[in-house]
Amino acid sequence: PLPTTRGNPTGPKESKKEVESKTETDPFAW
């Protein structure tokens, strides 16, 4: 489960997209 509260107020769907972009800088986004 991804923490939507981590700067992702748009929702889990957008969160996944953000994670893909933050994966390299956000290891916790996994």
Swiss-Prot record:
Extract the ranges annotated as region (Disordered): 1-30
Q: What is its main location?
A: host cell
Q: Which GO terms describe its cellular component?
A: extracellular region; host cell cytoplasm; host cell nucleolus
Subcellular localization? Host nucleus, Host nucleolus; Host cytoplasm; Secreted
* Keywords linked to the UniProt accession: Acetylation, Activator, AIDS, Apoptosis, Host cytoplasm, Host nucleus, Host-virus interaction, Metal-binding, Methylation, Phosphoprotein, RNA-binding, Secreted, Transcription, Transcription regulation, Ubl conjugation, Zinc
A molecular function GO annotation = metal ion binding
Highest taxon of the source?
Viruses
Role = Transcriptional activator that increases RNA Pol II processivity, thereby increasing the level of full-length viral transcripts. Recognizes a hairpin structure at the 5'-LTR of the nascent viral mRNAs referred to as the transactivation responsive RNA element (TAR) and recruits the cyclin T1-CDK9 complex (P-TEFb complex) that will in turn hyperphosphorylate the RNA polymerase II to allow efficient elongation. The CDK9 component of P-TEFb and other Tat-activated kinases hyperphosphorylate the C-terminus of RNA Pol II that becomes stabilized and much more processive.
Domain comment (free text) = The transactivation domain mediates the interaction with CCNT1, GCN5L2, and MDM2. The Arg-rich RNA-binding region binds the TAR RNA. This region also mediates the nuclear localization through direct binding to KPNB1 and is involved in Tat's transfer across cell membranes (protein transduction). The same region is required for the interaction with EP300, PCAF, EIF2AK2 and KDR.
Q: What else is known?
A: HIV-1 lineages are divided in three main groups, M (for Major), O (for Outlier), and N (for New, or Non-M, Non-O). The vast majority of strains found worldwide belong to the group M. Group O seems to be endemic to and largely confined to Cameroon and neighboring countries in West Central Africa, where these viruses represent a small minority of HIV-1 strains. The group N is represented by a limited number of isolates from Cameroonian persons. The group M is further subdivided in 9 clades or subtypes (A to D, F to H, J and K).
Membership in a protein family: Belongs to the lentiviruses Tat family.
Listed under subunit, the entry gives:
Interacts with host CCNT1. Associates with the P-TEFb complex composed at least of Tat, P-TEFb (CDK9 and CCNT1), TAR RNA, RNA Pol II. Recruits the HATs CREBBP, TAF1/TFIID, EP300, PCAF and GCN5L2. Interacts with host KAT5/Tip60; this interaction targets the latter to degradation. Interacts with the host deacetylase SIRT1. Interacts with host capping enzyme RNGTT; this interaction stimulates RNGTT. Binds to host KDR, and to the host integrins ITGAV/ITGB3 and ITGA5/ITGB1. Interacts with host KPNB1/importin beta-1 without previous binding to KPNA1/importin alpha-1. Interacts with EIF2AK2.
What name is this protein filed under?
Answer: Protein Tat
Q: Which organism is it from?
A: Human immunodeficiency virus type 1 group M subtype A (isolate Z321)
Q: What lineage is this protein's organism placed in?
A: Viruses, Riboviria, Pararnavirae, Artverviricota, Revtraviricetes
